């Protein structure tokens, strides 16, 4: 089993309701730095057909781990309007 002990929930808003969420999810998974893990991805309907992706990213409670770093990587991906850390908690 891994030694991850915290999880950060990062909410990603696509730039448009027409964005292919499957493709966007794969692009976002590809930019998560190797030292992090991914527990799951959920889809959250927002309004007017817009759906947010919620990434449950695993990390360690030690220097060198920052969920803001992951959110910044997500913001660089095409078709991402915003990426914000919603919560961080121990697991």
Curated annotation (Swiss-Prot):
Classification via Gene3D superfamilies: 3.30.70.60
Role played: Promotes the exchange of GDP for GTP in EF-1-alpha/GDP, thus allowing the regeneration of EF-1-alpha/GTP that could then be used to form the ternary complex EF-1-alpha/GTP/AAtRNA.
HAMAP family named in the record: EF1_beta
UniProt family annotation: Belongs to the EF-1-beta/EF-1-delta family.
Keyword line: Elongation factor, Protein biosynthesis
Pfam families: EF1_GNE
Descriptive protein name: Elongation factor 1-beta
GO MF, one annotated term: translation elongation factor activity
